[in-house]
Amino acid sequence: MMKMKTLLALAISGICAAGVANAHDHMAKPAGPSIEVKVQQLDPANGNKDVGTVTITESNYGLVFTPNLQGLAEGLHGFHIHENPSCDPKEKDGKLTSGLAAGGHWDPKGAKQHGYPWQDDAHLGDLPALTVLHDGTATNPVLAPRLKKLDEVRGHSIMIHAGGDNHSDHPAPLGGGGPRMACGVIK
Protein backbone atom coordinates (compact mmCIF):
# COMPACT_ATOMS: atom_id res chain seq x y z
CA MET A 1 0.00 0.00 0.00
CA MET A 2 2.86 2.38 0.84
CA LYS A 3 4.42 1.80 -2.61
CA MET A 4 1.08 2.59 -4.24
CA LYS A 5 0.75 5.88 -2.32
CA THR A 6 4.33 6.83 -3.22
CA LEU A 7 3.74 6.06 -6.91
CA LEU A 8 0.47 7.99 -6.86
CA ALA A 9 2.14 10.99 -5.20
CA LEU A 10 4.96 10.93 -7.76
CA ALA A 11 2.50 10.67 -10.64
CA ILE A 12 0.42 13.60 -9.35
CA SER A 13 3.49 15.78 -8.77
CA GLY A 14 4.75 14.92 -12.27
CA ILE A 15 1.42 15.88 -13.82
CA CYS A 16 1.34 19.14 -11.83
CA ALA A 17 4.91 20.00 -12.83
CA ALA A 18 4.15 19.30 -16.49
CA GLY A 19 1.03 21.47 -16.28
CA VAL A 20 2.92 24.36 -14.69
CA ALA A 21 5.74 24.10 -17.24
CA ASN A 22 3.20 24.00 -20.09
CA ALA A 23 1.34 27.03 -18.68
CA HIS A 24 4.64 28.92 -18.32
CA ASP A 25 5.56 28.17 -21.94
CA HIS A 26 2.25 29.58 -23.13
CA MET A 27 2.53 32.70 -20.95
CA ALA A 28 6.13 33.41 -21.87
CA LYS A 29 5.61 33.53 -25.65
CA PRO A 30 3.11 35.78 -27.42
CA ALA A 31 0.95 33.63 -29.70
CA GLY A 32 0.37 35.98 -32.65
CA PRO A 33 2.09 36.09 -36.03
CA SER A 34 5.82 36.82 -35.85
CA ILE A 35 8.94 37.50 -37.87
CA GLU A 36 12.55 36.79 -36.95
CA VAL A 37 15.19 39.45 -37.58
CA LYS A 38 18.86 38.48 -37.81
CA VAL A 39 21.04 40.94 -35.88
CA GLN A 40 24.72 41.69 -36.48
CA GLN A 41 27.25 43.60 -34.42
CA LEU A 42 28.45 46.47 -36.60
CA ASP A 43 32.14 46.63 -37.47
CA PRO A 44 32.84 48.32 -40.83
CA ALA A 45 36.60 47.79 -40.47
CA ASN A 46 36.55 44.01 -39.88
CA GLY A 47 33.09 43.01 -41.07
CA ASN A 48 29.84 42.57 -39.18
CA LYS A 49 29.39 39.58 -36.85
CA ASP A 50 26.16 37.65 -36.19
CA VAL A 51 24.98 38.10 -32.59
CA GLY A 52 21.55 36.44 -32.74
CA THR A 53 17.97 37.36 -33.51
CA VAL A 54 15.05 39.50 -32.40
CA THR A 55 11.60 37.98 -32.90
CA ILE A 56 8.80 40.50 -33.40
CA THR A 57 5.35 39.18 -32.49
CA GLU A 58 1.86 40.65 -32.67
CA SER A 59 0.00 40.63 -29.34
CA ASN A 60 -3.22 42.16 -27.99
CA TYR A 61 -1.09 44.85 -26.34
CA GLY A 62 1.18 45.82 -29.24
CA LEU A 63 4.26 44.39 -30.90
CA VAL A 64 6.56 42.34 -28.66
CA PHE A 65 10.30 42.38 -29.47
CA THR A 66 11.97 39.27 -28.03
CA PRO A 67 15.76 39.30 -28.31
CA ASN A 68 17.90 36.18 -28.39
CA LEU A 69 21.26 37.92 -28.52
CA GLN A 70 24.78 37.18 -27.28
CA GLY A 71 28.20 38.79 -27.42
CA LEU A 72 27.02 42.31 -26.57
CA ALA A 73 28.38 44.73 -23.96
CA GLU A 74 26.69 44.47 -20.56
CA GLY A 75 24.17 47.13 -19.52
CA LEU A 76 21.22 49.09 -20.86
CA HIS A 77 21.26 50.00 -24.53
CA GLY A 78 19.11 52.23 -26.69
CA PHE A 79 16.81 50.06 -28.82
CA HIS A 80 14.94 51.56 -31.77
CA ILE A 81 13.34 51.03 -35.13
CA HIS A 82 15.19 53.09 -37.74
CA GLU A 83 13.82 54.43 -41.02
CA ASN A 84 15.62 52.41 -43.68
CA PRO A 85 16.04 48.66 -44.29
CA SER A 86 19.84 48.83 -44.24
CA CYS A 87 22.60 48.28 -41.69
CA ASP A 88 25.37 49.43 -44.03
CA PRO A 89 27.96 52.01 -42.99
CA LYS A 90 27.76 55.45 -44.57
CA GLU A 91 30.13 58.37 -44.65
CA LYS A 92 29.41 61.42 -42.49
CA ASP A 93 31.79 64.35 -42.18
CA GLY A 94 34.45 62.33 -44.01
CA LYS A 95 34.23 59.41 -41.57
CA LEU A 96 32.67 55.98 -42.18
CA THR A 97 29.93 55.52 -39.55
CA SER A 98 28.50 52.10 -38.62
CA GLY A 99 24.86 51.55 -39.55
CA LEU A 100 24.30 55.10 -40.75
CA ALA A 101 22.45 53.91 -43.88
CA ALA A 102 19.61 52.86 -41.52
CA GLY A 103 18.71 56.54 -41.23
CA GLY A 104 17.25 58.08 -38.10
CA HIS A 105 14.64 56.88 -35.64
CA TRP A 106 11.47 55.90 -37.50
CA ASP A 107 9.11 58.89 -37.23
CA PRO A 108 6.25 58.50 -39.76
CA LYS A 109 3.96 60.88 -37.84
CA GLY A 110 6.52 63.71 -37.75
CA ALA A 111 6.79 63.93 -33.95
CA LYS A 112 10.42 65.10 -34.29
CA GLN A 113 11.23 64.19 -30.69
CA HIS A 114 12.52 61.21 -28.76
CA GLY A 115 10.38 59.73 -26.00
CA TYR A 116 8.83 56.71 -24.34
CA PRO A 117 7.27 53.93 -26.43
CA TRP A 118 3.77 54.81 -25.15
CA GLN A 119 4.10 58.58 -25.77
CA ASP A 120 1.93 59.81 -28.66
CA ASP A 121 4.23 62.78 -29.32
CA ALA A 122 7.45 60.73 -29.77
CA HIS A 123 9.08 58.80 -32.62
CA LEU A 124 7.08 55.68 -33.40
CA GLY A 125 10.39 53.77 -33.50
CA ASP A 126 11.27 54.48 -29.86
CA LEU A 127 11.36 51.17 -27.97
CA PRO A 128 12.12 50.38 -24.31
CA ALA A 129 15.84 50.05 -23.55
CA LEU A 130 17.43 46.65 -24.16
CA THR A 131 18.93 44.94 -21.11
CA VAL A 132 22.14 42.97 -21.70
CA LEU A 133 23.29 40.76 -18.82
CA HIS A 134 26.85 40.35 -17.50
CA ASP A 135 27.37 37.34 -19.80
CA GLY A 136 26.59 39.43 -22.91
CA THR A 137 23.13 37.95 -23.51
CA ALA A 138 19.82 39.74 -24.00
CA THR A 139 16.59 37.74 -23.80
CA ASN A 140 14.12 40.06 -22.02
CA PRO A 141 11.20 40.95 -24.32
CA VAL A 142 10.05 44.56 -24.68
CA LEU A 143 6.62 45.88 -25.69
CA ALA A 144 5.87 48.62 -28.23
CA PRO A 145 2.24 49.44 -27.39
CA ARG A 146 1.66 51.92 -30.25
CA LEU A 147 2.74 49.38 -32.88
CA LYS A 148 0.08 46.78 -33.64
CA LYS A 149 0.91 44.93 -36.89
CA LEU A 150 4.08 43.41 -38.33
CA ASP A 151 3.47 45.19 -41.64
CA GLU A 152 4.04 48.52 -39.86
CA VAL A 153 7.69 47.66 -39.17
CA ARG A 154 8.61 45.66 -42.29
CA GLY A 155 11.02 47.55 -44.50
CA HIS A 156 12.79 49.24 -41.59
CA SER A 157 15.66 48.19 -39.31
CA ILE A 158 16.21 47.41 -35.64
CA MET A 159 19.11 49.34 -34.10
CA ILE A 160 20.91 48.78 -30.79
CA HIS A 161 22.98 51.71 -29.54
CA ALA A 162 25.92 51.58 -27.14
CA GLY A 163 24.80 52.99 -23.80
CA GLY A 164 21.43 53.66 -22.23
CA ASP A 165 18.41 55.67 -23.28
CA ASN A 166 16.65 58.26 -21.10
CA HIS A 167 13.73 58.52 -23.58
CA SER A 168 14.19 62.27 -23.91
CA ASP A 169 16.08 64.79 -26.00
CA HIS A 170 17.46 66.42 -22.83
CA PRO A 171 20.20 66.72 -21.70
CA ALA A 172 21.39 64.96 -24.89
CA PRO A 173 19.47 64.33 -28.12
CA LEU A 174 17.94 60.93 -28.93
CA GLY A 175 18.09 59.61 -25.38
CA GLY A 176 21.80 60.26 -24.93
CA GLY A 177 22.72 56.87 -26.40
CA GLY A 178 26.05 56.19 -28.00
CA PRO A 179 27.11 54.85 -31.38
CA ARG A 180 25.16 52.28 -33.36
CA MET A 181 26.51 48.90 -32.26
CA ALA A 182 24.15 46.24 -33.69
CA CYS A 183 21.51 46.20 -36.39
CA GLY A 184 19.05 43.97 -38.23
CA VAL A 185 16.85 44.55 -41.27
CA ILE A 186 13.14 43.81 -40.73
CA LYS A 187 11.96 41.89 -43.83
From Swiss-Prot:
Binding annotation for Zn(2+): 105, 114, 123, 126
Pfam families: Sod_Cu
Cofactor(s), names only, from the UniProt record: Cu cation; Zn(2+)
Chain sites annotated for binding Cu cation: 80, 82, 105, 161
Species annotation: Haemophilus parainfluenzae
Name under which the protein is recorded: Superoxide dismutase [Cu-Zn]
Keyword ATP-binding: no
Subunit structure: Homodimer.
GO molecular function, one term: copper ion binding
Disulfide bonds: 87-183
